[in-house]
Swiss-Prot record:
This protein's encoding gene: selU
The protein's name: tRNA 2-selenouridine synthase
One Pfam family of this chain: Rhodanese
Keywords associated with the record: Selenium, Transferase
Function: Involved in the post-transcriptional modification of the uridine at the wobble position (U34) of tRNA(Lys), tRNA(Glu) and tRNA(Gln). Catalyzes the conversion of 2-thiouridine (S2U-RNA) to 2-selenouridine (Se2U-RNA). Acts in a two-step process involving geranylation of 2-thiouridine (S2U) to S-geranyl-2-thiouridine (geS2U) and subsequent selenation of the latter derivative to 2-selenouridine (Se2U) in the tRNA chain.
UniProt key word Transmembrane: no
Gene3D superfamilies (UniProt xref): Rhodanese-like domain (3.40.250.10)
Catalysis: reaction(s): 5-methylaminomethyl-2-thiouridine(34) in tRNA + selenophosphate + (2E)-geranyl diphosphate + H2O + H(+) = 5-methylaminomethyl-2-selenouridine(34) in tRNA + (2E)-thiogeraniol + phosphate + diphosphate; 5-methylaminomethyl-2-thiouridine(34) in tRNA + (2E)-geranyl diphosphate = 5-methylaminomethyl-S-(2E)-geranyl-thiouridine(34) in tRNA + diphosphate; 5-methylaminomethyl-S-(2E)-geranyl-thiouridine(34) in tRNA + selenophosphate + H(+) = 5-methylaminomethyl-2-(Se-phospho)selenouridine(34) in tRNA + (2E)-thiogeraniol; 5-methylaminomethyl-2-(Se-phospho)selenouridine(34) in tRNA + H2O = 5-methylaminomethyl-2-selenouridine(34) in tRNA + phosphate
Amino acid sequence: MQERHTEQDYRALLIADTPIIDVRAPIEFEQGAMPAAINLPLMNNDERAAVGTCYKQQGSDAALALGHKLVAGEIRQQRMDAWRAACLQNPQGILCCARGGQRSHIVQRWLHEAGIDYPLVDGGYKALRQTAIQATIELSQKPIVLIGGCTGSGKTLLVQQQPNGVDLEGLARHRGSAFGRTLQPQLSQASFENLLAAEMLKTDARQELRLWVLEDESRMIGSNHLPECLRERMTQAAIAVVEDPFEIRLERLNEEYFLRMHHDFTHAYGDEQGWQEYCEYLHHGLSAIKRRLGLQRYNELAAQLDTALTTQLTTGSTDGHLAWLVPLLEEYYDPMYRYQLEKKAEKVVFRGEWAEVAEWVKAQ
């Protein structure tokens, strides 16, 4: 039964999206997990806590005995059934616990007794996590080109279309602004970093990578922050700025934030609740920048948002949203981005409309 030990083995697991049966407790999994992992714990949170307390008070033998007592009979059988099904569904997968210690070895042994030989990660999640951190540090050293531009410039799409592009907002499940949240909850910080590392490793493995194409992001993307090694390199990177006509930007924003988000909410929650969630999403985004807008301006825009939502509900038209979106761009988002760009003006190496920037990036 081959078990993996080397740094290259760990990297290969991440590049291949090897299915990982992670037998740690749910609380550990939520704090940080690998992208291709599924959580089928040997012990639940309460059982793990009880065994941990026993270990501190009575030692390892007593803790092991308690663990076997807690995971016995019908409970053990239910978990065995889940592991067996996962192994059969993922024959190329691998077992993982915190450090490649007792938990993954116990599950491996029980599976062997049931006629299934399944490998485990020697070193466990900790080894994979260290590999992810080291890979990000190493790969961040390659040159970077940032795609900049005001809100609605299509920066994310441009990055997505590059073979050497990494969509940081997609990985973070957030579009980086007050209106940036998606219907998917954001990952824990460690899980986000692991996902980013795996994406960088896979992108690098597919080609002779000369440089990265990334969106010009701030340190925070929603609740996730960029790894410091990557953030530091991004502050030194060249910037290509998309400068599209205002009307084209409005069309993109209408599609992304009104038409698509309304569709996504109603698809997820049904027409009635989906509409309420969509309205709440837009109001929450506007409310998040209330202090910067000032109370009077916020109240004016919030009233225009309500009017636009009423129009959208009754007619299906999203045109009414321009009444609050246009001033929001002209008074808040555009001046803020231009101010930020001025501070790094010496880094700007190209400016043009979307297609021109896309062509320039391909030539690099």
